[in-house]
C-alpha cells in the first residue's frame, strides 16, 4: 500500500491511499473517532484512578506534612521569639537595677570619700595650726633674741662709728639711750 519514492536528497516514506491520494491522519479518521474517544476515556479514567489512589494521597500527605512542619516551625519560632522578648525585658530590668545599684554605690562612696576628705582636711588644718603656732612662737623668740642682739650690735656699731669719726670713745650710757630711742621709733 505504501510506496517509497526517492528524490535527490534521499529516500522518504509516506502513506498514500490506492488511487494516488493521501490518507487522512489516523486520529482524525471518521471511522475510528468513536473508538478513540472510548479509548481516551478509559485511559483517562484509569490514569485518574491510579493517580487519585496512589500518587495524589502521597502528594497530599507530603503537602500536609510540609504544612504541619511549617506550622510547628512557626509556632516554635514564635515561642522562641516570646522567650527572647521576655529574656530581653528581664535583662533590661536587671540592667536598670544594676545601674541604680551602681549609682547608689557611687553616691555612697562619693559621700564617704567627701566625709573622709573633709575630716582629713580638718585634721590637717589642726596640725598646720599647731605647726603655725609653734612657728610663730619660734619666730617671736628668734625675733626677740635677734632684737636683743641687734641692740647690742647697734650699740657697738654706734660706738665704733662715733669713735672713728671723732677719734674719742663715747659714753656707753649715752650710746645705749640713743640706740633705745632709735629702736622705739
UniProtKB/Swiss-Prot annotation:
GO terms for cellular component: plasma membrane; proton-transporting ATP synthase complex. Keywords: ATP synthesis, Cell inner membrane, Cell membrane, CF(0), Hydrogen ion transport, Ion transport, Membrane, Transmembrane, Transmembrane helix, Transport. Residues 1-25 are annotated as: Disordered. GO terms for molecular function: proton-transporting ATP synthase activity, rotational mechanism; proton-transporting ATPase activity, rotational mechanism. It holds the Pfam family ATP-synt_B. InterPro entries: ATP_synth_b/b'su_bac/chlpt, ATP_synthase_B_chain. The chain crosses the membrane at residues 34-56. It is a single-pass membrane protein. It comes from the Bacteria. The keyword GTP-binding does not apply. F-type ATPases have 2 components, F(1) - the catalytic core - and F(0) - the membrane proton channel. F(1) has five subunits: alpha(3), beta(3), gamma(1), delta(1), epsilon(1). F(0) has three main subunits: a(1), b(2) and c(10-14). The alpha and beta chains form an alternating ring which encloses part of the gamma chain. F(1) is attached to F(0) by a central stalk formed by the gamma and epsilon chains, while a peripheral stalk is formed by the delta and b chains. Belongs to the ATPase B chain family. F(1)F(0) ATP synthase produces ATP from ADP in the presence of a proton or sodium gradient. F-type ATPases consist of two structural domains, F(1) containing the extramembraneous catalytic core and F(0) containing the membrane proton channel, linked together by a central stalk and a peripheral stalk. During catalysis, ATP synthesis in the catalytic domain of F(1) is coupled via a rotary mechanism of the central stalk subunits to proton translocation. This is ATP synthase subunit b 2.
Amino acid at each position: 500500500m505504501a510506496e517509497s519514492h526517492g528524490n535527490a536528497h534521499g529516500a522518504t516514506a509516506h502513506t498514500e491511499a490506492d488511487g494516488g491520494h493521501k490518507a487522512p491522519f489516523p486520529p482524525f479518521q471518521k471511522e475510528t473517532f468513536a473508538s478513540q474517544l472510548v479509548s481516551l476515556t478509559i485511559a483517562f479514567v484509569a490514569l485518574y484512578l491510579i493517580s487519585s489512589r496512589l500518587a495524589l494521597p502521597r502528594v497530599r500527605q507530603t503537602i500536609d506534612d510540609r504544612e504541619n512542619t511549617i506550622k510547628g516551625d512557626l509556632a516554635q519560632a514564635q515561642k522562641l521569639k516570646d522567650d527572647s522578648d521576655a529574656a530581653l525585658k528581664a535583662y533590661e530590668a536587671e540592667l536598670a537595677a544594676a545601674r541604680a545599684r551602681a549609682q547608689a554605690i557611687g553616691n555612697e562612696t562619693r559621700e564617704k570619700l567627701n566625709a573622709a576628705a573633709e575630716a582629713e582636711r580638718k585634721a590637717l588644718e589642726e596640725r598646720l595650726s599647731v605647726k603655725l603656732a609653734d612657728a610663730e612662737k619660734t619666730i617671736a623668740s628668734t625675733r626677740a633674741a635677734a632684737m636683743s642682739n641687734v641692740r647690742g650690735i647697734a650699740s657697738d656699731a654706734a660706738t665704733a662709728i662715733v669713735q672713728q669719726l671723732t677719734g674719742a670713745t663715747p659714753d656707753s650710757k649715752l650710746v645705749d639711750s640713743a640706740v633705745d630711742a632709735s629702736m622705739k621709733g
